[in-house]
Amino acid sequence: MTIEPDDDIVLQVSDLEVTFEGRAVLSDLSFSVARGEILTILGPNGAGKTVLLRSLLGIVPYHGSITWEPGLRIGYVPQRLPYIRNMPLSVADFFGFKSGSTGDVPVMLDTVGLPPELAGNLIGDLSSGQFQRVLIAWALAGDPHLLLFDEPTAGVDVRGTETVYALLSRLYQERNLTMLVVTHDLAVVHRLSSMVLCLNRKPVCHGPPLSVLTPENLQRLYGTEVRFYEHGHE
């Protein structure tokens, strides 16, 4: 399958299957992503959500087809980079690792609500919330059309979580981005997402959150009763 540049679809996944050592980690997975969509990928630990993102990036082998719109620029915000935090690197040094991102680091930091002087700080001295915003700024440095987020608030406290999700909402509006967001945070799904993919090694549901996040589907997804506890996002 090919995707034309003027199509509304920027990503088409068909019959995706990933196996590790003969065990199916993902199977029977087909979905598409439209331009401007925010797709939340929801599921329990071990559901294959991170494997899906890595498959989309071509990092892990897979069967089936993954088709991106030609020329689409993609940014990726991983769940954790602990080894980076243990290295004696400044924020500016970290940006220097990325080809094409050696420009004005303070401006990039300002984009994600961080003070420009933070460029000289060591990565290891940042709070979890600050580091997560640095990763987002790093992903934005290549001026992407689409961003992939793997648990963008993992290890971040409640206040930092609110800040990160408010930032994602603002960036989406200001930059006309398409986003794929892996999260465990049910409370933000209705506020942030236009579509949700419920995944537990196989697709459980896919569609608008208000339509598909029923008690029955959530029980199928998690194997227990799940209730929403809403955060307040500005």
Language-model features and meaning:
Residues 147-151:
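Catalytic Walker B motif of ABC-type/P-loop ATPase nucleotide-binding domains
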